[in-house]
A protein has these predicted regions:
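A ligand-binding cleft/hinge motif common to bilobed small-molecule-binding domains
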Residues: 85, 102-110, 156-161, 184, ...
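Short helix-initiation/N-cap motifs at beta->coil->alpha
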Residues: 77-88, 132-133, 170-185, 220
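Periplasmic-binding protein-like
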Residues: 44, 120-127, 203-240, 262-275
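Extracytoplasmic small-molecule ligand-binding "clamshell" domains
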Residues: 27-101
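Ligand-binding clefts/hinges and TM-proximal coupling segments of bilobed small-molecule sensing domains
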Residues: 27, 152-170, 210-211, 243-275
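Ligand-binding cleft/hinge of the Venus flytrap
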Residues: 52, 65-74, 153-172, 202-206
Length: 275
């Protein structure tokens, strides 16, 4: 009797251990499918990709991740925080993928795996409307300019002004909205950001802002970064497949036209970024 009881207890314990091990053996995609939720981290000061419209999170990223969610059979849970905390938040496991998006660079590719690109990310300058002192990018020499902290756009702006004969003073802002506010107030003469972003801002406020042509930055693309490890491989594979389907059936172009007024020709993947 005691022997049979001991044997049953041993089998039960083994079952519990096996079940627990099985739960831990699930990779990121399996856990997300089991929970039914994909957690996506982003900021809300990067229009038209992410911004707050009448108290609601809106933008290209919201629309595109809605389509990704349909393909994966899950719902999206947005985790909103300042941009400088987004990539550290990904690595800390606060969410499953960044819905920023971020400029694809060689340095970032060493650390993260990027999805197919969603738009061009070449950097240009935004100035005050009617400011004739800045008619080309080189005109910011010796002046005060600004950009968003911890961004690839800010890095390109700093590199560009270093090439000018009269070095510009580059101010770093917590977000692009703060930089745009200082530009409108005349505290700086230009803001460096990706062309899609500043074109959207200038379109929304044509009496206040104007894009300086041509862009000064290196040709680059925006994509969503995720973790580059075995646990997240199947998740990133699934998101990549979903995004390529969304691109090929025309949904991406429709979303781009909604937010940019035009569609971008982008490669399926950026394997060798210029930056």
């Amino acid at each position: 009797m005691q022997k049979r009881f001991f044997l049953k207890a041993l089998v039960g314990a083994a079952f519990l251990v096996g079940a627990t091990a099985g739960a831990y053996a699930q990779d990121a995609l399996a856990r997300i499918q089991a929970s039914g939720t994909l957690k996506v981290g982003t900021e809300t000061a990067f229009a038209p990709f992410d911004f707050i419209d009448a108290g609601t999170h809106a933008g290209l990223n919201v629309d595109l991740f809605d389509e990704i969610a349909k393909e994966l059979g899950v719902k999206i849970e947005w985790v909103l925080l300042p941009w400088e905390g987004v990539l550290p938040g990904l690595e800390a496991g606060k969410f499953d993928i960044v819905g920023g998006p971020a400029t694809v660079t060689k340095q970032r590719m060493e650390r993260y795996r990027f999805t197919p690109p969603v738009a061009e990310a070449t950097v240009a300058l935004l100035k005050r409307a009617g400011d004739e002192s800045v008619t080309k990018p080189e005109d910011v020499a010796g002046k005060v300019v600004g950009g968003g902290k911890a961004s690839a756009q800010l890095d390109q702006l700093k590199a560009f002004v270093d090439t000018l004969p009269g070095k510009a003073d580059v101010r770093e802002y917590p977000g692009n909205n703060e930089a745009y506010a200082d530009l409108a107030a005349g505290r700086i003469v230009a803001v460096g950001n990706s062309l899609p972003n500043i074109a959207f801002v200038a379109k929304q406020r044509p009496d206040t802002f104007e894009v300086v042509q041509p862009p000064f930055g290196t040709k680059a693309y925006f994509a969503y970064p995720g973790l580059k490890d075995d646990d997240h491989k199947s998740l990133m594979d699934a998101i990549e497949a979903a995004m390529l389907k969304i691109k090929n059936d025309g949904r991406l172009a429709t979303i781009q036209e909604k937010w940019f007024g035009a569609k971008f020709e982008t490669p399926d993947l950026v394997n060798e970024p210029a930056l």
